Amino acid sequence: MSQVRKNDHSLMKVLLGPVISEKATMVAEKNEQVVFQVARDANKSDVKQAVELLFKVQVDSVQIVNQKGKPKRYGRFEGRRDHTKKAYVNLKPGQEINFEAEAN
């Protein structure tokens, strides 16, 4: 299967933001992984290209998880939250992404 390189503008829309949670922090410390919220139509190669473009790091592999939206009630009305997609990005040894902003 050949990989089609998307243009830089469309790759900017793939990553929606980092996932900052207890599980994501434990995974990051233990396995050199970073967790991102990604667009619903993104695939593994899109995520890999976007991370390498934005953060200037080398990506080893990508695992993607589809999360179903939770059912919620608002009074007598039932609905659900939107479905989401997360990507677990394995970085090559020695690579690191730091999300903390430095104050000057």
Curated annotation (Swiss-Prot):
InterPro entries: Nucleotide-bd_a/b_plait_sf, Ribosomal_uL23-like, Ribosomal_uL23/eL15/eS24_sf. GO terms for cellular component: ribonucleoprotein complex; ribosome. GO terms for molecular function: rRNA binding; structural constituent of ribosome. Disulfide bonds: none annotated. It comes from the Bacteria. Keywords: Ribonucleoprotein, Ribosomal protein, RNA-binding, rRNA-binding. The keyword RNA-binding applies. Gene3D superfamilies: 3.30.70.330. GO terms for biological process: translation. The keyword Hydrolase does not apply. SUPFAM superfamilies: Ribosomal proteins S24e, L23 and L15e (SSF54189). NCBIfam families: PRK05738.1-3 (NF004359), PRK05738.2-4 (NF004363). One of the early assembly proteins it binds 23S rRNA. One of the proteins that surrounds the polypeptide exit tunnel on the outside of the ribosome. Forms the main docking site for trigger factor binding to the ribosome. Belongs to the universal ribosomal protein uL23 family. HAMAP family: Ribosomal_uL23_B. Part of the 50S ribosomal subunit. Contacts protein L29, and trigger factor when it is bound to the ribosome. This is Large ribosomal subunit protein uL23. It comes from Polynucleobacter asymbioticus (strain DSM 18221 / CIP 109841 / QLW-P1DMWA-1).
